[in-house]
Amino acid sequence: MTVACKAGAATRYGRSGGRIQPLRGFWAAALMFAFVLGFHAMTTPLQAQTPPLKLVALGDSLTAGYNLPGSAAFPAVLEKLLREKGISVEIANAGVSGDTSQGGLERLDWSVPDGTDGVILELGANDALRGIDPAVAEKALDAIVTRLKARGIPVLLAGMYAPRNLGSDYATRFDGLYPRIAEKHGLILYPFFLDGIAGDRVLNQPDLLHPTAEGVRVIATRILPTVERFLATLRPRS
């Protein structure tokens, strides 16, 4: 009986018996689960390492953040708003107080390094305040855009309006230079950088020329949809 029992056991639990088949299914499922986990572990770090878009805000004191901490300047505030919307981006502050369009052109190469994905160009306010011939400002801004395009760097152009005390002829010539440049180069244009705050005593500092921190937030919020449209046109770096 002992022998019969062993033989029966061999028949019941042998290689063709009922307990080996479930184990095969178990190990197959376990191997598949391990493969999925391994694949996820391999791909997730690669996704996490996708570099953020690198922008440069090239401008004057309106970009630099005159009398404001760096965290309250336009580039930092805009970057924060974009990140809150899930857009991975870094915006370098290349604003220089008092800079004219010609000044921006002269420092262009070191202000906008290689590897930049796009530029927000905000210059011209000081040209108008000094009464510089709009043709001079237009020539400098056109040269900036031309050189950036030659380097494969897209540009979002932020426009400016001339003070009306300079006369209607000057204002017409100055205000029109931004649409002309945008049309010539096929740029996205934000018509007036100070839209929503110009002349507002609450949103500007006592000089009525430079925005307060709250004024900067208004600027960044208003330009945000245009910046998002600009970012959608950028090609990711390889």
How should each PLM-predicted stretch be described?
Residues 50, 77, 84-87, 103-238:
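Alpha-helical cap/lid subdomain in secreted, periplasmic
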Residues 28-41:
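Bacterial N-terminal signal peptides
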Residues 40-48:
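Signal peptide processing junction and immediate N-terminal pro/mature segment
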Residues 98-102:
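N-terminal helical cap/lid subdomain that shapes the substrate entry/recognition surface
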